[in-house]
A protein has these predicted regions:
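Periplasmic-side early beta-strands and strand-to-turn transitions of outer-membrane beta-barrels
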Residues: 242, 260-347
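Gram-negative outer-membrane beta-barrel transporters
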Residues: 601, 605-610, 627-721, 798, ...
Length: 804
């Protein structure tokens, strides 16, 4: 710990003692005063230069004596020069004139966004950025886009609305934090599906594969996904309708009105997603010892999904705060519980989530150069599981007597309640080439299970024993960027606090009698933990950059792991946080004109991670419970190549290899028993997968200024074992092996009506292959999708219905 304090002091001292002259201000468009992101401002004849951020702000070190010439330039704008006399710190705002109307409408906004993405890619973190502009109007879902990204694999258990796990460098599930605009997405009851987020509202997606930025709270074990949404502050009307196989329908309606004079922004949005998910599957599933004649095709009839989302927002832009937003969202869903062993028809889950929230942002808060962001949201959740069926319909049509359709063979009719308060407070202070960032992320959760039928099994009313959790994460980071942006260094320190009070309301289900002694006991856990990370980024040669980072991360158990679900999962009273040590080495090449190609981008990462206290779900009596495992070790690499062959042809290929093994040699029992799975591959995680594809896009093929795109994507996942391979017999190994698969997807897009409308067609799983990503969880076959998108923006800079 002393070494950490010493390192912190050494890194922060230059900030305190630096004596330099600074030129600072904003770079804006002359006509509209819109901030220009990615504009270059430089001292002519020197290496001193910098880029403006997304708010148009810049800071530049300038000579202390004499006069110097400032040059300001940005793609699509006329170059500006000014002679400035040296002296003290100077504040200057620069206004650039568009070089032409077409550039202003087509090039400028995209180039500014590209500059912002490049700044993220050059940071010391191991990060991949997916440009949302290229996804606009496509029929693909967010999960489908992510699973084609290097180092990432999304594991789905079914169609729309089914459970899924996002894997980043072998870390998956809740170890990968998911954010929207830097705020945790993970819904408290786990009901929110990432695919419910419309792909057209995405600005870009950041995928962090090691260090997680301090402003996101760092609540991930070395992996995080941040979905950055578009903020088009102008009048707009949008409508999207998508139809797909298996009864899938997605509808999105949105509208926004900007009152310029008072600076008031009002917006509303609604989406509805539903699907029957009634695709065919082979039955019995994964019974490899049966003859071919024993298999038959059956239709899933209880895998339906429906979700509705309503949003209303009111924003103020001319108050003391630069951004003052009041928003409220209402989300509800319903999902059938599909069984693979019989033809389920009745069991289902449903949930309601009301989420009022407040967002405050202020630049130059209290002092010059200090930016403040504050967000608070109070989710109010109601979740239900209903399973009261007294019969079961078998796949052959016969009906048998039963107690429910779920695996626990108990009637369930839960009405659970959950209330949360989540807040995030962030301060960022920039002075010269140094940036300090202080982030505080707080979460409080109260969970009250209620089930009248479960009350009879337990012998007491579980709603009389609510559980509580309080968690807080404080992170402090320092970022240094050299004058020419060639070197960057990021140091982060984090403190985690957990306070949980949990009642063991499910313990009585393991008993055979009901007495007063079965009333649950409360267990309280209160602990603090620390984490840190250090990252370096250095430009070795022009367009070639190396990255090195190390992090010690902690993931605090979430409410679902601590509280259980009141039905099939017991509370985990002594659950410990997961701890991981990560080492990443990466290289980036981004060069134009290489070997006659328009642009070549290449990224590769080598990673090593040692993790302990891995949280896994295991059987416990008639229920399940989350428990901590020992140690696991991960070694791997991923590489990603993107090539713009010509202005119209684009190719990509990415590959991931990883080796994940159990490194717990001995069990922590009194006898010191040896672990039979020591040094064996951790099951149920793909070790080898790759993606490749090509795209042809052009402007003016069908109508002047209309855009066209044709593409093909291919995803391959190598075979992997679902369980520990303890046998050397080929027949036994085959029973637990998930086969490899190759999924081909083809699609086309066409814009219409001056790019205010787009039509998209996509065919997924072209060859209708039987596909598994989870054991005994077949995925849909060939799927046809059609999407119509209409978007009308008052501000043409906001873009059209699709983009190249």
């Amino acid at each position: 710990m002393k070494r950490l304090i010493l390192i912190t002091i050494v890194c922060l001292c230059p900030l305190l003692v630096a004596a330099q002259r600074l030129l600072r201000g904003k770079i804006m468009e002359k006509e509209t005063s819109t901030p220009i992101c990615g504009a270059c401002i430089a001292v002519k004849g020197t290496k001193q230069k910098t880029l403006s951020d997304k708010a148009g702000d810049y800071q530049l070190t300038v000579p202390t004596v004499g006069a110097y010439t400032i040059e300001v330039s940005a793609v699509g704008y006329k170059r500006l020069r000014e002679v400035v006399a040296a002296g003290g710190d100077v504040t200057r705002d620069y206004y650039l004139e568009p070089s032409s109307t077409s550039l202003r409408e087509v090039v400028v906004r995209s180039s500014a966004q590209s500059a912002e993405i490049n700044q993220i890619r050059q940071s010391p973190m191991a990060v991949t950025v997916v440009d949302g502009a290229k996804l606009r109007g496509r029929s693909s879902s967010i999960e489908e886009i992510l699973t084609r990204t290097s180092g990432i694999k999304v594991r789905k258990a079914g169609g729309l609305g089914s459970a899924s796990r996002i894997s980043v460098h072998g870390l998956e599930g809740k170890r990968v934090a998911v954010y929207i605009d830097g705020f945790p997405l993970n819904s408290p009851d786990g009901s929110f599906d990432i695919n419910d987020i419309p792909i057209d509202v995405i600005k870009y997606i950041e995928v962090y594969k090691g260090i997680v930025p301090a402003e996101y709270g760092g609540d991930g074990l070395g992996g995080a996904i941040n979905i950055v949404t578009r903020e088009d502050e102008c009048d707009l009307v949008g409508f999207t309708q998508e139809l797909a196989s298996f009864g899938t329908v997605k509808t999105l309606v949105s509208g926004q009105k900007l009152f310029s004079r008072p600076g008031i922004l009002f917006n509303v949005a609604f989406f509805k997603n539903k699907s029957k998910n009634d695709y065919m599957m082979s039955w019995p599933v994964f019974e490899t010892n049966l003859p071919a004649s024993a298999y038959r095709k059956v239709r899933r009839r209880n895998d339906y999904y429906e979700a509705n989302f309503y949003h209303v927002g009111l924003g103020f832009r001319k108050l003391y705060f630069d951004k003052f937003d009041l928003e409220c969202a209402f989300y509800q869903n319903k999902k059938g519980i599909q069984s693979l062993n019989f033809d389920a028809r009745h069991a289902y889950t449903k949930g309601i989530n009301i989420m009022p929230n407040l967002v405050l942002e202020k630049q130059d808060f209290l002092v010059k150069g200090l930016d403040m962001k504050y967000t608070i949201v109070t989710p109010i959740i109601r979740s239900n599981m209903t399973d009261t069926a007294t019969t079961r319909r078998q796949w052959d049509g016969t009906v048998t007597q039963a107690v429910g359709e779920t695996d626990d063979n108990l009637f369930n009719e839960s009405h659970d309640r959950q209330f949360e308060v989540r807040s995030k407070f962030n301060l960022k202070y920039t002075r010269g080439r140094h940036t300090l960032n202080l982030n505080d992320q707080y979460a409080y959760s109260a969970y009250t299970p209620k089930d009248e039928r479960m009350k009879g099994y337990l012998g007491f009313d579980p709603s009389a024993y609510p559980s509580r959790m309080t968690a807080n994460n404080i992170g402090l980071s320092h970022l240094f960027v050299s004058a020419n942006h060639r070197f960057q260094n990021a140091l982060t320190l984090s403190i985690y606090y957990l306070n949980s009070r949990i009642y063991r309301t499910s313990d009585a289900l393991a008993k055979g009698q009901v007495t007063d002694e079965l009333a649950p006991k409360q267990t309280r856990v209160e602990r603090s933990y620390y984490g840190f990370s250090e990252g370096f980024s250095y430009e070795l040669w022009k367009d070639v950059r190396a990255k090195l980072s190390f992090s010690h991360n902690v993931r605090i158990p979430d409410t679902g792991e601590l509280f259980g679900n009141g039905v099939s999962i017991k509370p985990s009273v002594n659950l410990q946080p997961e701890v991981g040590n990560n080492l990443n080495l990466g290289f980036i090449v981004d060069r134009r004109g290489l070997c006659g190609l328009v642009r070549v981008q290449w990224e590769t990462n080598f990673y090593y991670m040692m993790m302990k206290n891995m949280i896994r779900l295991f059987p416990a009596d008639t229920r399940s419970i989350y428990t901590n495992l020992g140690k696991t070790r991960t070694i791997g690499m991923d590489t990603d190549v993107k090539v713009d062959v010509t202005r119209n042809v684009y190719l990509y290929f990415n590959l991931t290899l990883q080796d994940i093994r159990d490194r717990q040699r001995w069990f922590n029992d009194e006898q010191g028993t040896s672990n039979p799975t020591y040094n064996k591959h951790v099951p149920n995680i793909p070790a080898f997968y790759y993606n490749y594809g090509m795209e042809y896009h052009a402007e003016g093929l069908i109508g002047r200024r209309e855009l066209s795109r044709v593409y093909i994507d291919v995803s391959h996942v190598g075979e992997f074992d679902w369980g520990w391979q303890m046998s050397s017999l080929a027949e036994e190994r085959r029973k637990w092996r998930i086969p490899s698969n190759d999924i081909f997807t083809i699609g086309l897009q066409q814009s219409l009506w001056h790019n205010n409308m787009s039509l998209s067609l996509e065919l997924e799983n072209v060859f209708n292959k039987e596909n598994y990503m989870e054991f005994k969880m077949p995925l849909p076959g060939r799927t046809l999708k059609a999407k119509l998108r209409f978007n009308l923006f008052r501000d043409k800079l906001a873009g059209g219905a699709m983009s190249l």
